[in-house]
Amino acid sequence: GRLMLITGNRGCGKTVLLRELQRLASERGWAVVSDSASLGLCDRLAEALRSNKPVVTSMEFGPSFGRMSVEAARAKGETLRGLVNERLKKLGPGKGILFAIDEAQSASIEELAALAVLYQQVLGDQDATGLPDSDQRGLALVFAGLPSMVDDLLEEPSVTFLRRAQQRTLGAISLPKVRDSYIQTVKDAGLYVDTETADLAAHKSMGHPYMVQLVGYYMWRSAVRRNLQVIERCDVEAGHADAISEFYEAVDAPLYYGLRSPQRLFIEAMAADEGKPTRMADIIERCDRTQSWASKYRASLIRERVIEAAGYGLVRFTVPMLGAYISDRILWHE
């Protein structure tokens, strides 16, 4: 398929997978344009196509804080159509252009609608050439974003084309697979780790893709620093501590500070339970707020996949170590 939607919570490897798809497309002779879905996306895609480079990555990041008129978005879509068709003529039979769009939840609805029209038009333009399917040039769109916010996008009438996309949801990796990957990767690096130690490392990672990467790297570095060829339990413990610190800064901190003040107050109340599910009654008491207030922000945090229901009247974190981060870095002085 040439239309794909990759979803997953923070740190689950969406951007890594997006980059791998770009690499594979480039190796097969496709032109690749990658960008982040903030306002002005269509303009940046057009500029990238004008550059005529085989792979173009925009450095534009951040959420969209504005809206674009439907008319303006359509005009930009028409401009893109001409540039795409012009670029496709320069590619070999069966090749095409890949637009890899990260942070899809921050996209302008109008610009996504323009891309939807563009996608259909380019397919129609290629069908009109009369060439065999194998020789037609194509346009592929791959989007990556957070599940809850992408869910909102799928409800927009103007971007229903996304519902036809192949959807890939990234989540936790099974611990046996993590253990086996540690054993093999360490072996490939010229070191050794026994099954028991690799199993400990897998449990420390919780199967979270980013933590798997961090724990593996830091336990390896610990052994190398000690000039050893064998990774031991102490390396796993040291590596885990370093991994937690980096995970805090890369995942938990941006999430925490990206929430609204009432949402932060809500999850700060949850952090007091140290990893156990929290009673809604306790949140109301700790925050000194009403039932309706708690219900409102419970719903918003569940929608944004920060927390989830854990039974009747209970909630828990969905983001690894978020409660520990709040306790260690936010509430430590209290």
What are these regions (language model features)?
Residues R10, G207, M211-Q291:
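Winged-helix-like regulatory helical subdomains adjacent to P-loop NTPase cores
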Residues L170-T197, K204, V215:
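Conserved small helical "lid"/interfacial subdomain of P-loop NTPases
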Residues E155-G171:
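A short helix-turn-beta junction within AAA+ P-loop NTPase domains corresponding to the substrate/partner-engaging
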Residues S26-V32, L39-E71:
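Conserved NTP-binding/hydrolysis module of P-loop NTPases
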Residues F247, P320-E334:
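Short, amphipathic alpha-helical interaction segments positioned at domain boundaries
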Residues R74-S148, E155-S158:
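Conserved Walker B catalytic segment
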Residues E110, C287-E304, Y312:
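Short amphipathic alpha-helical interaction segments
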